[in-house]
Protein backbone atom coordinates (compact mmCIF):
# COMPACT_ATOMS: atom_id res chain seq x y z
CA UNK A 1 0.00 0.00 0.00
CA UNK A 2 2.79 2.42 0.96
CA UNK A 3 4.56 1.92 -2.37
CA UNK A 4 1.39 2.64 -4.36
CA UNK A 5 1.05 5.99 -2.58
CA UNK A 6 4.65 6.84 -3.45
CA UNK A 7 4.09 5.65 -7.01
CA UNK A 8 1.31 8.21 -7.52
CA UNK A 9 3.80 10.96 -6.72
CA UNK A 10 6.59 9.42 -8.78
CA UNK A 11 4.31 9.12 -11.81
CA UNK A 12 3.86 12.90 -11.75
CA UNK A 13 7.59 13.25 -12.46
CA UNK A 14 9.49 12.61 -15.69
CA UNK A 15 10.16 8.82 -15.78
CA UNK A 16 13.93 9.12 -16.07
CA UNK A 17 14.13 11.55 -13.14
CA UNK A 18 11.80 9.35 -11.08
CA UNK A 19 14.00 6.35 -11.86
CA UNK A 20 17.07 8.15 -10.48
CA UNK A 21 15.19 9.39 -7.39
CA UNK A 22 14.04 5.87 -6.49
CA UNK A 23 17.55 4.46 -6.80
CA UNK A 24 18.98 7.28 -4.66
CA UNK A 25 16.23 6.65 -2.10
CA UNK A 26 17.04 2.93 -1.95
CA UNK A 27 20.72 3.81 -1.56
CA UNK A 28 20.24 6.13 1.43
CA UNK A 29 21.68 4.91 4.74
CA UNK A 30 18.48 5.71 6.67
CA UNK A 31 16.43 3.46 4.41
CA UNK A 32 18.95 0.67 4.74
CA UNK A 33 18.79 0.90 8.56
CA UNK A 34 14.97 0.82 8.51
CA UNK A 35 15.06 -2.21 6.23
CA UNK A 36 17.17 -4.13 8.72
CA UNK A 37 14.68 -3.33 11.49
CA UNK A 38 11.35 -3.88 9.74
CA UNK A 39 11.85 -6.25 6.80
CA UNK A 40 12.00 -9.99 7.41
CA UNK A 41 14.81 -11.92 5.70
CA UNK A 42 13.95 -13.71 2.47
CA UNK A 43 14.21 -17.52 2.74
CA UNK A 44 16.89 -19.14 0.58
CA UNK A 45 15.49 -21.13 -2.35
CA UNK A 46 18.74 -22.00 -4.05
CA UNK A 47 18.89 -23.24 -7.62
CA UNK A 48 21.87 -24.30 -9.70
CA UNK A 49 22.05 -23.03 -13.27
CA UNK A 50 24.96 -22.52 -15.70
CA UNK A 51 27.28 -23.90 -13.03
CA UNK A 52 26.30 -21.09 -10.65
CA UNK A 53 24.27 -21.21 -7.43
CA UNK A 54 21.46 -18.63 -7.33
CA UNK A 55 19.76 -17.81 -4.00
CA UNK A 56 16.41 -17.88 -5.82
CA UNK A 57 15.03 -17.80 -9.36
CA UNK A 58 14.14 -14.09 -9.44
CA UNK A 59 16.64 -11.63 -10.88
CA UNK A 60 16.73 -7.95 -11.73
CA UNK A 61 16.87 -7.36 -15.48
CA UNK A 62 19.47 -5.11 -17.08
CA UNK A 63 18.55 -1.44 -17.48
CA UNK A 64 17.62 -0.61 -13.90
CA UNK A 65 21.23 -0.09 -12.79
CA UNK A 66 23.18 0.64 -15.95
CA UNK A 67 26.46 1.60 -14.28
CA UNK A 68 26.47 -0.63 -11.20
CA UNK A 69 25.99 2.33 -8.84
CA UNK A 70 23.26 0.66 -6.79
CA UNK A 71 24.17 -3.04 -6.64
CA UNK A 72 24.28 -3.26 -2.84
CA UNK A 73 21.00 -1.43 -2.21
CA UNK A 74 19.12 -3.33 -4.93
CA UNK A 75 20.41 -6.63 -3.57
CA UNK A 76 18.59 -5.90 -0.28
CA UNK A 77 15.26 -6.29 -2.08
CA UNK A 78 15.93 -10.02 -2.20
CA UNK A 79 16.88 -10.71 -5.81
CA UNK A 80 18.61 -14.02 -6.45
CA UNK A 81 20.77 -12.26 -8.99
CA UNK A 82 21.33 -8.77 -10.36
CA UNK A 83 22.16 -7.90 -13.95
CA UNK A 84 23.81 -4.50 -14.46
CA UNK A 85 24.27 -2.61 -17.74
CA UNK A 86 23.92 -2.40 -20.65
CA UNK A 87 27.45 -1.00 -20.68
CA UNK A 88 29.68 -0.19 -23.67
CA UNK A 89 33.47 0.14 -24.05
CA UNK A 90 33.30 3.96 -24.05
CA UNK A 91 30.89 6.26 -22.19
CA UNK A 92 27.99 7.56 -24.27
CA UNK A 93 24.98 9.82 -23.71
CA UNK A 94 22.43 7.70 -25.51
CA UNK A 95 19.46 9.09 -27.41
CA UNK A 96 18.00 12.58 -26.84
CA UNK A 97 15.55 13.10 -23.95
CA UNK A 98 12.72 12.47 -23.30
CA UNK A 99 13.38 8.77 -23.91
CA UNK A 100 11.21 6.86 -21.40
CA UNK A 101 7.41 6.86 -21.51
CA UNK A 102 4.94 5.16 -19.19
CA UNK A 103 1.78 3.43 -20.36
CA UNK A 104 0.14 3.00 -16.91
CA UNK A 105 -3.25 1.70 -18.03
CA UNK A 106 -1.62 -1.53 -19.20
CA UNK A 107 1.53 -1.45 -17.04
CA UNK A 108 3.76 -0.80 -20.03
CA UNK A 109 6.94 1.21 -20.57
CA UNK A 110 8.38 2.49 -23.85
CA UNK A 111 12.04 3.39 -23.89
CA UNK A 112 14.55 4.54 -26.47
CA UNK A 113 17.49 5.06 -24.12
CA UNK A 114 20.21 4.02 -26.58
CA UNK A 115 22.72 2.41 -24.21
CA UNK A 116 23.38 5.55 -22.15
CA UNK A 117 26.16 4.63 -19.72
CA UNK A 118 29.43 5.79 -18.19
CA UNK A 119 31.58 3.14 -19.85
CA UNK A 120 32.98 -0.25 -18.96
CA UNK A 121 35.80 1.02 -16.72
CA UNK A 122 33.38 2.94 -14.49
CA UNK A 123 31.14 -0.12 -14.10
CA UNK A 124 34.07 -2.43 -13.32
CA UNK A 125 35.14 -0.13 -10.46
CA UNK A 126 31.62 -0.26 -9.02
CA UNK A 127 31.45 -4.06 -9.24
CA UNK A 128 34.84 -4.29 -7.51
CA UNK A 129 33.58 -2.04 -4.67
CA UNK A 130 30.28 -3.89 -4.23
CA UNK A 131 29.76 -5.87 -1.02
CA UNK A 132 27.07 -8.05 -2.62
CA UNK A 133 28.17 -11.70 -2.53
CA UNK A 134 25.46 -13.00 -4.85
CA UNK A 135 25.33 -13.47 -8.61
CA UNK A 136 26.13 -10.37 -10.68
CA UNK A 137 25.52 -10.52 -14.42
CA UNK A 138 27.08 -7.83 -16.59
CA UNK A 139 25.19 -6.91 -19.76
CA UNK A 140 27.35 -5.53 -22.58
CA UNK A 141 26.70 -3.82 -25.91
CA UNK A 142 28.41 -1.92 -28.68
CA UNK A 143 28.97 1.83 -28.85
CA UNK A 144 26.63 3.77 -31.11
CA UNK A 145 29.49 4.99 -33.34
CA UNK A 146 30.95 1.52 -33.86
CA UNK A 147 30.07 0.15 -37.29
CA UNK A 148 28.06 -3.05 -37.21
CA UNK A 149 30.87 -4.83 -39.09
CA UNK A 150 33.21 -3.95 -36.20
CA UNK A 151 30.73 -4.58 -33.38
CA UNK A 152 32.36 -7.82 -32.26
CA UNK A 153 35.46 -5.86 -31.23
CA UNK A 154 33.37 -3.86 -28.73
CA UNK A 155 32.01 -7.04 -27.15
CA UNK A 156 35.49 -8.56 -26.92
CA UNK A 157 36.86 -5.41 -25.25
CA UNK A 158 34.09 -5.57 -22.66
CA UNK A 159 34.50 -9.31 -22.04
CA UNK A 160 38.22 -8.87 -21.41
CA UNK A 161 37.64 -6.06 -18.90
CA UNK A 162 34.76 -7.60 -16.95
CA UNK A 163 35.53 -11.31 -17.11
CA UNK A 164 37.25 -11.61 -13.74
CA UNK A 165 34.50 -9.67 -11.92
CA UNK A 166 31.32 -11.04 -13.55
CA UNK A 167 29.33 -14.08 -12.43
CA UNK A 168 27.98 -14.27 -15.98
CA UNK A 169 28.13 -12.04 -19.06
CA UNK A 170 25.06 -11.10 -21.12
CA UNK A 171 25.59 -10.19 -24.78
CA UNK A 172 22.94 -7.64 -25.78
CA UNK A 173 22.36 -7.88 -29.53
CA UNK A 174 18.63 -7.20 -29.40
CA UNK A 175 18.02 -3.65 -28.17
CA UNK A 176 15.87 -1.85 -30.75
CA UNK A 177 17.34 1.53 -29.78
CA UNK A 178 20.84 1.21 -31.28
CA UNK A 179 20.83 1.42 -35.08
CA UNK A 180 21.47 -1.92 -36.81
CA UNK A 181 22.24 -3.73 -33.54
CA UNK A 182 19.63 -6.42 -34.18
CA UNK A 183 21.44 -7.40 -37.39
CA UNK A 184 23.85 -9.25 -35.12
CA UNK A 185 21.11 -11.86 -34.59
CA UNK A 186 21.29 -12.96 -38.23
CA UNK A 187 23.49 -14.82 -40.68
CA UNK A 188 27.25 -14.62 -40.75
CA UNK A 189 27.32 -11.71 -38.26
CA UNK A 190 25.62 -13.92 -35.66
CA UNK A 191 27.89 -16.90 -36.31
CA UNK A 192 31.04 -14.78 -36.20
CA UNK A 193 29.90 -13.20 -32.94
CA UNK A 194 29.24 -16.56 -31.27
CA UNK A 195 32.52 -18.00 -32.52
CA UNK A 196 34.62 -15.04 -31.38
CA UNK A 197 33.06 -14.61 -27.94
CA UNK A 198 33.50 -18.33 -27.22
CA UNK A 199 37.14 -18.04 -28.27
CA UNK A 200 37.59 -15.03 -25.96
CA UNK A 201 35.81 -16.90 -23.14
CA UNK A 202 38.26 -19.78 -23.55
CA UNK A 203 41.23 -17.38 -23.42
CA UNK A 204 39.93 -15.71 -20.26
CA UNK A 205 39.14 -19.09 -18.69
CA UNK A 206 42.77 -20.12 -19.18
CA UNK A 207 44.06 -16.78 -17.92
CA UNK A 208 42.03 -16.65 -14.69
CA UNK A 209 41.23 -20.34 -14.11
CA UNK A 210 37.61 -19.22 -13.81
CA UNK A 211 34.75 -20.17 -16.13
CA UNK A 212 32.27 -17.32 -16.60
CA UNK A 213 29.07 -18.30 -18.47
CA UNK A 214 28.07 -16.22 -21.49
CA UNK A 215 24.39 -15.72 -22.37
CA UNK A 216 22.80 -14.10 -25.42
CA UNK A 217 19.87 -11.69 -25.04
CA UNK A 218 17.46 -11.94 -27.98
CA UNK A 219 14.53 -10.03 -29.43
CA UNK A 220 10.84 -10.93 -29.05
CA UNK A 221 10.27 -9.89 -32.67
CA UNK A 222 12.00 -12.91 -34.22
CA UNK A 223 9.96 -15.39 -36.27
CA UNK A 224 9.61 -19.04 -35.31
CA UNK A 225 11.97 -20.00 -38.15
CA UNK A 226 14.55 -17.48 -36.92
CA UNK A 227 14.25 -18.74 -33.34
CA UNK A 228 14.81 -22.33 -34.47
CA UNK A 229 17.91 -21.22 -36.38
CA UNK A 230 19.20 -19.28 -33.35
CA UNK A 231 18.56 -22.30 -31.11
CA UNK A 232 20.63 -24.52 -33.38
CA UNK A 233 23.52 -22.06 -33.43
CA UNK A 234 23.46 -21.59 -29.65
CA UNK A 235 23.76 -25.35 -29.24
CA UNK A 236 26.46 -25.64 -31.91
CA UNK A 237 28.66 -22.98 -30.31
CA UNK A 238 27.93 -24.20 -26.77
CA UNK A 239 26.58 -20.90 -25.51
CA UNK A 240 25.80 -21.10 -21.79
CA UNK A 241 22.35 -19.50 -21.75
CA UNK A 242 19.81 -17.29 -23.49
CA UNK A 243 17.76 -14.36 -22.17
CA UNK A 244 14.28 -14.12 -23.67
CA UNK A 245 13.45 -11.40 -24.30
CA UNK A 246 14.37 -7.78 -24.85
CA UNK A 247 11.74 -5.10 -25.59
CA UNK A 248 9.49 -5.22 -28.65
CA UNK A 249 8.99 -2.78 -31.52
CA UNK A 250 5.46 -4.13 -31.97
CA UNK A 251 3.10 -1.57 -30.43
CA UNK A 252 -0.08 -3.08 -31.87
CA UNK A 253 -1.18 -4.17 -28.38
CA UNK A 254 -1.51 -0.56 -27.24
CA UNK A 255 -3.64 1.22 -29.87
CA UNK A 256 -5.23 4.57 -28.96
CA UNK A 257 -3.37 4.73 -25.64
CA UNK A 258 -1.31 7.74 -24.57
CA UNK A 259 2.34 7.46 -25.68
CA UNK A 260 1.60 4.52 -28.01
CA UNK A 261 3.09 6.43 -30.94
CA UNK A 262 6.41 7.05 -29.20
CA UNK A 263 9.29 5.24 -30.85
CA UNK A 264 11.23 2.69 -28.83
CA UNK A 265 11.06 -0.72 -27.24
CA UNK A 266 7.87 -1.67 -25.40
CA UNK A 267 8.18 -3.64 -22.17
CA UNK A 268 5.96 -4.59 -19.27
CA UNK A 269 2.63 -6.39 -19.44
CA UNK A 270 2.15 -5.91 -23.23
CA UNK A 271 5.34 -7.95 -23.75
CA UNK A 272 4.18 -10.89 -21.64
CA UNK A 273 2.63 -13.10 -24.35
CA UNK A 274 5.36 -12.42 -26.92
CA UNK A 275 8.04 -13.29 -24.40
CA UNK A 276 6.25 -16.47 -23.32
CA UNK A 277 5.83 -17.58 -26.94
CA UNK A 278 9.55 -17.09 -27.60
CA UNK A 279 10.47 -19.03 -24.44
CA UNK A 280 8.20 -21.92 -25.48
CA UNK A 281 9.81 -22.15 -28.93
CA UNK A 282 13.31 -21.96 -27.45
CA UNK A 283 12.51 -24.61 -24.85
CA UNK A 284 11.29 -27.03 -27.51
CA UNK A 285 14.31 -26.50 -29.78
CA UNK A 286 17.09 -26.15 -27.22
CA UNK A 287 16.09 -29.56 -25.82
CA UNK A 288 17.19 -28.61 -22.29
CA UNK A 289 20.79 -28.26 -23.46
CA UNK A 290 20.86 -24.51 -22.76
CA UNK A 291 19.07 -22.76 -19.87
CA UNK A 292 16.61 -19.94 -20.51
CA UNK A 293 16.27 -16.74 -18.48
CA UNK A 294 12.73 -15.47 -19.01
CA UNK A 295 11.90 -11.78 -18.86
CA UNK A 296 8.97 -9.70 -20.05
CA UNK A 297 5.67 -8.80 -18.42
CA UNK A 298 6.01 -10.45 -15.01
CA UNK A 299 3.54 -8.58 -12.81
CA UNK A 300 2.19 -11.31 -10.50
CA UNK A 301 3.02 -14.69 -9.03
CA UNK A 302 0.89 -16.30 -11.76
CA UNK A 303 2.80 -14.59 -14.58
CA UNK A 304 6.07 -15.64 -12.92
CA UNK A 305 4.84 -19.24 -12.85
CA UNK A 306 3.81 -19.02 -16.51
CA UNK A 307 7.38 -18.13 -17.48
CA UNK A 308 8.65 -21.21 -15.63
CA UNK A 309 5.96 -23.41 -17.21
CA UNK A 310 6.94 -22.15 -20.68
CA UNK A 311 10.47 -23.36 -20.03
CA UNK A 312 12.40 -20.63 -18.21
CA UNK A 313 14.95 -21.82 -15.64
CA UNK A 314 15.32 -18.35 -14.14
CA UNK A 315 13.28 -15.17 -14.50
CA UNK A 316 13.98 -11.44 -14.42
CA UNK A 317 11.84 -8.45 -13.52
CA UNK A 318 12.05 -4.77 -14.43
CA UNK A 319 8.71 -3.10 -15.23
CA UNK A 320 6.96 -5.13 -12.53
CA UNK A 321 9.26 -3.57 -9.94
CA UNK A 322 8.38 -0.09 -11.18
CA UNK A 323 4.63 -0.72 -11.14
CA UNK A 324 4.40 -2.84 -7.97
CA UNK A 325 7.43 -2.06 -5.83
CA UNK A 326 9.90 -4.13 -3.77
CA UNK A 327 7.27 -6.09 -1.81
CA UNK A 328 6.07 -7.55 -5.11
CA UNK A 329 9.52 -9.11 -5.62
CA UNK A 330 9.56 -10.58 -2.11
CA UNK A 331 6.07 -12.06 -2.57
CA UNK A 332 7.13 -13.82 -5.77
CA UNK A 333 10.26 -15.20 -4.09
CA UNK A 334 8.23 -16.56 -1.16
CA UNK A 335 5.55 -18.14 -3.33
CA UNK A 336 7.38 -19.38 -6.41
Curated annotation (Swiss-Prot):
InterPro entries referenced in this protein's UniProt entry, alphabetically: Aldolase_TIM, DHO_dehydrogenase, Dihydroorotate_DH_1_2, Dihydroorotate_DH_2, Dihydroorotate_DH_cat, Dihydroorotate_DH_CS
UniProt subunit comment: Monomer.
Record membrane topology: Peripheral membrane protein
CDD domains according to UniProt: DHOD_2_like (cd04738)
Gene: pyrD
Name the record gives this protein: Dihydroorotate dehydrogenase (quinone)
Native species: Buchnera aphidicola subsp. Schizaphis graminum (strain Sg)
Protein's pathway: Pyrimidine metabolism; UMP biosynthesis via de novo pathway; orotate from (S)-dihydroorotate (quinone route): step 1/1
Entry binding sites for substrate: 66, 111-115, 172, 177, 246-247
UniProt-annotated catalytic positions: 175
Cofactor note: Binds 1 FMN per subunit.
PROSITE patterns noted in UniProt: DHODEHASE_1 (PS00911), DHODEHASE_2 (PS00912)
Entries under SUPFAM superfamilies matching the protein: FMN-linked oxidoreductases
EC number(s) reported in the record: 1.3.5.2
Biological processes per GO annotation: 'de novo' pyrimidine nucleobase biosynthetic process; 'de novo' UMP biosynthetic process
Cofactor(s) essential for the protein: FMN
Pfam families with a match to the protein in the record: DHO_dh
Molecular function (Gene Ontology), one example: dihydroorotate dehydrogenase (quinone) activity
Residues that hold FMN according to the record: 62-66, 86, 139, 172, 217, 245, 268, 297, 318-319
Amino acid sequence: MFYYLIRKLLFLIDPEKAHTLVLMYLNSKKIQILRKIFIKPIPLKQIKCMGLTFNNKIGLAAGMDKNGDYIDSLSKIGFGFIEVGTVTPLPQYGNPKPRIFRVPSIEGIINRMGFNNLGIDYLVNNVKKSKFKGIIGINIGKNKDTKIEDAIKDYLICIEKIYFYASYIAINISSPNTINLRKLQYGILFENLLRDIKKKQSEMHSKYSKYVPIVIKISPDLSKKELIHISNKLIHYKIDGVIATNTTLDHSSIPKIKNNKEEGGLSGLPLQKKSNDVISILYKNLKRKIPIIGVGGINSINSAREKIMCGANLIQVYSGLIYHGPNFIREIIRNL
